[in-house]
């Protein structure tokens, strides 16, 4: 099968790769771009471990055809930090013990970032809905929800 040239922005920098037709974005990011932060969980869109932002909206990279991001912007956990400084969501996840094994964390953070970028002051229910497509077997979700709410309020605890 012939390869297709693909150009997109990845965490703020231009990327050009050649992909096989039908390959998903997760495989492209991990195998061709070298970004290992989106995780392979189920490969069927059921766990959220591969959540990335495409033009600011949360998408499951395992269900997204690589060719569909031509000319678009893709952001992963690697793009969240600003040099040595953690993103407020990353800091809040640490402060609220929102990660245990950490496998779901990249997808949770990206889903939460999409929410806060579109709605800087979400309600608890809006946070729950935003992360509903992301499975976490360790935390019971409360620390994650609390971390997102804290990040939204500038680090101050919210009820």
How should each PLM-predicted stretch be described?
Residues 1-159:
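Signature of N-terminal electron-transfer/Fe-S-associated modules in redox systems
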């Amino acid at each position: 099968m012939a390869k297709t040239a693909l150009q997109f922005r990845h965490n703020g920098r231009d990327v050009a790769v050649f992909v096989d037709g039908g390959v998903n974005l997760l495989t492209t990011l991990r195998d061709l771009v070298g970004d290992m932060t989106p995780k392979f969980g189920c490969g069927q869109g059921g766990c959220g471990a591969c959540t990335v932002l495409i033009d600011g909206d949360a998408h499951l990279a395992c269900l997204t055809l690589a060719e569909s991001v031509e000319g678009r912007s893709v952001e992963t956990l690697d793009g969240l930090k600003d040099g040595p400084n953690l993103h407020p969501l990353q800091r809040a996840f640490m402060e609220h013990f929102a990660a245990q094994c950490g496998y779901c964390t990249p997808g949770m953070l990206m889903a939460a970032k999409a929410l806060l970028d579109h709605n800087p002051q979400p309600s608890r229910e809006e946070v729950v809905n935003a992360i509903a497509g992301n499975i976490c077997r360790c935390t019971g979700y409360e620390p994650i929800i609390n971390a997102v709410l804290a990040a939204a309020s500038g680090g101050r605890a919210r009820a």
